[in-house]
Swiss-Prot record:
GO terms for molecular function: G protein-coupled receptor activity; olfactory receptor activity. Belongs to the G-protein coupled receptor 1 family. It is found in: Cell membrane. This is Olfactory receptor 4P4. Residues 48-55, 119-137, 218-233, 288-312 are cytoplasmic. Glycans are attached at residues 5-6. It comes from Homo sapiens. Odorant receptor. Residues 1-23, 78-98, 157-193, 257-267 are extracellular. The chain crosses the membrane at residues 24-47, 56-77, 99-118, 138-156, 194-217, 234-256, 268-287. It is a multi-pass membrane protein.
């Protein structure tokens, strides 16, 4: 059967039709977007300009911050523009591009979080072999695998959606183009496609989440034999990552591990992994991390001293 696509334009319904609420949301999301850029750039500069870049934990954190910036930038700018626009429209081509990029960078983020959990597992459960196992070559390989996994995931979502005909209503009950809200507009039987989407998005999120949980079960089992001081240090290192994982995975699992259907709450849950998690990640990873705080002080104190020397 040939694809018959009469929809060349989609209308994004967003959060509200009330103009006052939209202006308030614009100010809020503008603040969030600026905070995301400032926080994640601060993390990246502090890591790359110090010796922390040579430690696997911070090597992955650097790439997590980069993926956060890319991921939120596929959604937030368009969302802010729509909040001030009279008609919240997006062309079919741009919708497909947004679908691909959000799942590409979202997939990368999921796999990097899994890689970071593996790094913590090796550091705590196999400390004597840590430097050998987590070599720079191994870290680079993990990042390449994360990017490849993200591409395969997003390409699958893209291919499953691009051949679906859209010839009926063109209103997407969301603030960006995602698979489930789009499939709701399809004018053909999408039962099999829905199962494939669940197998792709749902299972990836579920399997990686289970792997993350298992890694921390092994970590908790291992640190039982540690002294109180070592146990406290190990838990402090892992707690930041656990908070980020829950913040990102819990809403993603709620949305993607169910049959093809949408709820009005999906838009709120999607905010957690598209805007809230990228905004809080820098704060979560630096709040209880002495090394990260010291690196920031070192970088920015050097910058202040350089500026003073230039003035005098």
């Amino acid at each position: 059967m040939e694809k018959s696509n009469n929809s060349t334009l989609f209308i994004l319904l967003g959060f509200s039709q009330n103009k006052n609420i939209e202006v308030l949301c614009f100010v809020l999301f503008l603040f969030c977007y600026i905070a995301i850029w400032m926080g994640n750039l601060l993390i990246m500069i502090s890591i790359t300009c110090t010796q922390l870049i040579h430690q696997p934990m911070y090597f992955f954190l650097n790439y997590l911050s980069l993926s956060d910036l890319c991921y939120t930038s596929t959604v937030t700018p368009k969302l802010m523009v729509d909040l001030l626009a009279e008609r919240k429209t997006i062309s079919y081509n741009n919708c497909m591009i947004q679908l691909f990029t959000t799942h590409f960078f979202g997939g990368i983020e999921i796999f990097i979080l899994t890689g970071m959990a593996y790094d913590r597992y090796v550091a705590i459960c196999k400390p004597l072999h840590y430097t050998i196992i987590m070599s720079r070559q191994k870290c680079n390989t993990i990042i390449i695998v994360c990017c490849t996994g993200g591409f395969i995931h997003s390409a699958s979502q893209f291919l499953l959606t691009i051949f679906v005909p859209f010839c009926g209503p063109n209103e997407i009950d969301h603030y960006f183009c995602d698979v489930y809200p789009l499939l709701k507009l399809a004018c053909s039987n999408i039962h099999m496609i829905g199962l494939l989407v669940i197998a792709n998005s749902g299972l990836i999120a579920l399997v990686t989440f289970v792997v993350l949980l298992l890694s921390y079960v092994f970590i908790l089992y291992t640190i039982r034999a540690y002294s109180a001081e070592r146990r406290s240090k190990a838990l402090a290192t892992c707690s930041s990552h656990v908070i980020v994982v829950v913040l990102f995975f819990a809403p993603a699992l709620f949305i993607y591990i169910r049959p093809v259907t949408t709820f009005s709450e999906d838009k709120v849950f999607a905010l957690f992994y598209t805007i809230i998690a990228p905004m809080f990640n820098p704060l979560i990873y630096t709040l209880r991390n002495t090394e990260m705080k010291n690196a920031m002080r070192k970088v920015w104190c050097c910058q202040i001293l350089l500026k003073r020397n230039q003035l005098f």
